[in-house]
């Protein structure tokens, strides 16, 4: 059973009441089907109300859920013949990034993604999904290989950010991220990026320069965490909920700002409720994106990518005079 979040307590309590009635019915052999049916209708309405009106901070909580599907979960669901590749050929291998070749509906593709752990031991091994420079350089090595063999690149984004430790800085963290941005902008094959959890700062962006950028409904994409923003703006990390509402980090906000292309609907309650069903929703958008991009010539692909990023952040001057009393 999935771990419930704080705001889901009313749902949890009502489910508990329904389960109690079912147990009572079985033990006492009393027909309470009408009462159970009424409670189930109330439960459905409650879920619709809560999950249909999620606040930014609640989406952050879902994006961070410990049982949320990872890159490897989606690779297992969406691709066949996945062969993971290791190492950047410069320093070492970084398990915070998974990269390899696979087949998607019979088509050879390159798949790259952040990978966090499912428990403490795996999180330590994968550095909690926060890559070192060798992780980004491994990703770039696979991207250049994909370009050589004309394979589309599919990136799954799910990280709190690039690892900010001393060793990472010594090995050129900022250069590795910047190099990926530069190379992805000119990569001569289709790139589809999907934010499946947290999209944290440059650590996410280093896998996020694509021809299509999609987000799961309850994922986030931001330049800094809400806690970090709150600490900077108000000197109080406990103001994270307020920061999340101000920062415009959710999929609906970023769709409105034209940062992303599509919002992928999530299973009610979050992707962790049903991985297979969530993968089907991703599959529909991914197939459509690859079909559209594969029909373009290399020149058309690069020109459209250039125009896509050129218009992000455009603004208009307001010429109306402002009077100050």
Curated annotation (Swiss-Prot):
PROSITE patterns: COA_CT_CTER (PS50989)
Disulfide bonds: none
UniProt GO molecular function: acetyl-CoA carboxylase activity; ATP binding; carboxyl- or carbamoyltransferase activity
Catalysed reactions listed for this entry: N(6)-carboxybiotinyl-L-lysyl-[protein] + acetyl-CoA = N(6)-biotinyl-L-lysyl-[protein] + malonyl-CoA
Keywords in alphabetical order: ATP-binding, Cytoplasm, Fatty acid biosynthesis, Fatty acid metabolism, Lipid biosynthesis, Lipid metabolism, Nucleotide-binding, Transferase
UniProt GO BP: fatty acid biosynthetic process; malonyl-CoA biosynthetic process
Cellular component, GO annotation: acetyl-CoA carboxylase complex
Domain CoA carboxyltransferase C-terminal, residue spans: 38-292
SUBUNIT field: Acetyl-CoA carboxylase is a heterohexamer composed of biotin carboxyl carrier protein (AccB), biotin carboxylase (AccC) and two subunits each of ACCase subunit alpha (AccA) and ACCase subunit beta (AccD).
Protein name per UniProt: Acetyl-coenzyme A carboxylase carboxyl transferase subunit alpha
Native source species: Halalkalibacterium halodurans (strain ATCC BAA-125 / DSM 18197 / FERM 7344 / JCM 9153 / C-125)
Originating gene: accA
């Amino acid at each position: 059973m999935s771990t419930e979040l704080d705001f889901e307590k009313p749902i949890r309590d009502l489910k508990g009441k329904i389960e109690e009635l079912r147990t009572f019915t079985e033990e006492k052999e009393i027909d309470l089907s009408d009462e159970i049916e009424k409670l189930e209708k109330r439960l459905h309405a409650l879920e619709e109300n809560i999950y249909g009106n999620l606040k930014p901070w609640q989406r952050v909580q879902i994006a961070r859920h410990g049982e949320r599907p990872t890159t490897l979960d989606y690779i297992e669901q969406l691709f066949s013949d996945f062969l993971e590749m290791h190492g950047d050929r410069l320093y070492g291998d970084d398990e915070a990034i998974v990269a390899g070749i696979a087949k998607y509906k019979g088509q050879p593709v390159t798949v790259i993604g952040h990978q966090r752990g499912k428990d403490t031991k795996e999180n330590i091994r994968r550095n909690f999904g926060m890559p070192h420079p060798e992780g980004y350089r491994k990703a770039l090595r696979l991207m250049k290989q994909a370009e050589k063999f004309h394979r589309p690149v599919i990136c799954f984004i799910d990280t709190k950010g690039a690892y900010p430790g001393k060793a990472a800085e010594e090995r050129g963290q900022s250069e590795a991220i910047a190099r990926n941005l530069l190379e992805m902008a000119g990569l001569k094959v289709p790139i589809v990026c999907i934010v499946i959890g947290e999209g944290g700062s440059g650590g996410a962006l280093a896998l996020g320069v694509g021809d299509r950028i999609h987000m799961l409904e309850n994922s986030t994409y931001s330049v800094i965490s809400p806690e970090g923003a709150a600490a900077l703006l108000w000197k109080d990390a406990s103001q994270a909920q307020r920061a999340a509402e101000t920062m415009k980090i959710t999929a609906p906000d970023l769709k409105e700002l034209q940062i992303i292309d599509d919002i992928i609907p999530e299973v009610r309650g979050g992707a962790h409720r049903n991985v297979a069903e969530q993968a089907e929703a991703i599959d529909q958008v991914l197939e459509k994106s690859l079909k559209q991009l594969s029909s373009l010539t290399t020149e058309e692909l690069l020109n459209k990518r250039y125009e896509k990023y050129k218009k992000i952040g455009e603004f208009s001057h307001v010429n109306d005079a402002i009077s100050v009393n």
